[in-house]
A protein has these predicted regions:
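Positively charged, small/polar-rich N-terminal and surface patches that mediate targeting and assembly
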Residues: 1-109
Length: 109
């Protein structure tokens, strides 16, 4: 199994969620986060002055999938999140040793 951790622009979240659901990826954990990468923040005009915002709002999506579903999920996320502009996001793929469903005790390795 793999944990696919994705960080995207908030305005792309509904597109990504819909695309994932259409491909059968329904369970996910969503967290509102702040961060920066290549983008290094933005400069805004505020009350007549310039203000630098170096940590931008992002959405983090976490989903655990079978190894065989990893590439399909990555393609789905990439296609639905991409705008072609700096700050589109990042995908991390992390091995998962096992998962345990708390309600039933069912283990998946």
């Amino acid at each position: 199994m793999k944990l696919v951790k994705t960080i995207i622009k908030p305005e792309r979240f509904e597109f990504v969620k819909k695309a994932m659901e259409e491909k059968g990826f329904k369970g996910m954990t969503i967290t509102e986060v702040k961060g920066r990468g290549e983008q290094k923040g933005i400069t805004l005009e505020y009350r007549g002055g310039l203000m630098t915002v170096d940590l931008l709002p992002k959405i983090q999506i976490e989903i655990v999938v079978r190894d065989s579903d990893t590439d399909s999920l990555i393609s789905t996320i990439t296609e639905s999140a991409r705008t072609g502009k700096i700050g589109d996001g990042k995908i991390f793929v992390i091995p998962v040793e096992k998962s345990i469903r708390i309600r039933t005790g069912e283990t998946e390795a």
